From Swiss-Prot:
<feature type="active site" description="Proton acceptor">
    <location>
        <position position="176"/>
    </location>
</feature>
<dbReference type="InterPro" id="IPR001236">
    <property type="entry name" value="Lactate/malate_DH_N"/>
</dbReference>
<comment type="similarity">
    <text>Belongs to the LDH/MDH superfamily. MDH type 3 family.</text>
</comment>
<dbReference type="InterPro" id="IPR036291">
    <property type="entry name" value="NAD(P)-bd_dom_sf"/>
</dbReference>
<dbReference type="InterPro" id="IPR022383">
    <property type="entry name" value="Lactate/malate_DH_C"/>
</dbReference>
<dbReference type="Pfam" id="PF02866">
    <property type="entry name" value="Ldh_1_C"/>
</dbReference>
<feature type="binding site">
    <location>
        <position position="152"/>
    </location>
    <ligand>
        <name>substrate</name>
    </ligand>
</feature>
<dbReference type="Pfam" id="PF00056">
    <property type="entry name" value="Ldh_1_N"/>
</dbReference>
<dbReference type="InterPro" id="IPR001557">
    <property type="entry name" value="L-lactate/malate_DH"/>
</dbReference>
<dbReference type="GO" id="GO:0006099">
    <property type="term" value="P:tricarboxylic acid cycle"/>
</dbReference>
<feature type="binding site">
    <location>
        <position position="83"/>
    </location>
    <ligand>
        <name>substrate</name>
    </ligand>
</feature>
<keyword id="KW-0520">NAD</keyword>
<feature type="binding site">
    <location>
        <position position="96"/>
    </location>
    <ligand>
        <name>NAD(+)</name>
    </ligand>
</feature>
<feature type="binding site">
    <location>
        <position position="121"/>
    </location>
    <ligand>
        <name>substrate</name>
    </ligand>
</feature>
<keyword id="KW-0816">Tricarboxylic acid cycle</keyword>
<feature type="binding site">
    <location>
        <begin position="119"/>
        <end position="121"/>
    </location>
    <ligand>
        <name>NAD(+)</name>
    </ligand>
</feature>
<dbReference type="GO" id="GO:0030060">
    <property type="term" value="F:L-malate dehydrogenase (NAD+) activity"/>
</dbReference>
């Protein structure tokens, strides 16, 4: 049986980490693509040389030509400019939209059957544009945001309660930006709702509110600390979890940026929602009940994403 083929568009910090994780998990052979000559080749060789130590079998190929991604089963897109201190994800719009146009053309030509995961910011607008540029069906093109934002939320909660991250369930809806919606009401520790933990004296509502805000600011916190780039370990791990669920037909329930067709009152836009990811891509979109405040927050987040999509159309009218 032939190995799966995983193509990584962009060989920066996230791309290199993706390649390493794909190797460690033996998800398939990896192609690293980048416009910078030598970078994907060097990283691919370096990771390949770690395989005898870590005991995994996979082929790593570096390339500067889209032809190398031909026939890929999964394509993960990280290409574009990362955030720097003081920048919002939205500041990257004009630059990264042009990148998505080139990437979309490459995927359309060489990997039209692939499951595509976009990580490039501003995430929700970029995955929306990438789907249009590539022409791939919407259920095969998703954005990585909710898994990462939820992981941050889960980690902060585990620290607050001094429990294993494995026992914390939490997820985040909406756009991947300052208006994201961490849902405390649907978050639990070993099945115990956060509201009950407040009553039990494990934490306070004020502390939970601060954790929710820290989750929203999670990416900016790391950008501020690194000063020269943005997060890459957690984003890469999140995308690999999505790719693994697709490749192994695990049918994981994961929050991803998916195209909505009426769910949550939204049409033809990519927004973070809980989904089932299996061998057919997005196999189901889970529409949960939101209370009045949650719905207002979600609608605000959707409006923010809609504004970014309109800005994209202003730059590239063909997206309309």
């Amino acid at each position: 049986m032939a190995r799966n083929k995983i193509a990584l568009i962009g060989s920066g910090m996230i791309g290199g980490t993706l390649a390493h994780l794909a190797g460690l998990k033996e998800l398939g052979d990896v192609v690293l693509f980048d416009i910078a000559e030598g970078t994907p080749q060097g990283k691919g060789l370096d990771i390949a040389e770690s395989s005898p130590v870590d005991g995994f079998d996979a082929k790593f190929t570096g390339a500067n030509d889209y032809a190398a991604i031909e026939g890929a089963d999964v394509v993960i897109v990280t290409a574009g400019v990362p955030r720097k201190p003081g920048m919002s994800r939205d500041d990257l719009l004009g630059i990264n939209l042009k990148v998505m146009e080139q990437v979309g053309a490459g995927i359309k030509k060489y990997a039209p059957e692939a499951f595509v995961i976009c990580i490039t910011n501003p995430l929700d607008a970029m995955v929306w544009a990438l789907q249009k540029f590539s022409g791939l069906p919407a259920h095969k093109v998703v954005g990585m945001a909710g898994v990462l934002d939820s992981a941050r939320f889960r980690y902060f909660l585990s620290e607050e309660f001094n429990v294993s991250v494995e026992d914390v369930t939490a997820f985040v809806l909406g756009g991947h930006g300052d208006s994201m919606v961490p849902l405390a009401r649907y978050s639990t520790v070993a099945g115990i709702p956060l509201s009950d933990l407040v009553k039990m004296g494990w934490t306070s509502q004020d502390k939970l509110d601060k954790i929710i805000q820290r989750t929203r600011d999670g990416g900016a916190e790391i950008v501020g600390l690194l000063k020269t780039g943005s997060a890459f370990y957690a984003p890469a791990a999140s995308a690999i979890q999505m790719a693994e669920s697709y490749l192994k037909d695990k049918k994981r329930v994961l929050p991803v940026a998916a195209q909505l067709s009426g769910q949550y009152g939204v049409k033809d836009m990519y927004v973070g929602v809980p989904t089932v990811i299996g061998a057919n891509g997005v196999e189901r979109i889970i529409e949960i009940d939101l209370d009045k405040d949650e719905k207002a927050q979600f609608d605000k987040s959707v409006a923010s994403v809609a504004g970014l999509c309109e800005a994209c159309i202003g730059i590239a009218p063909s997206l309309k």
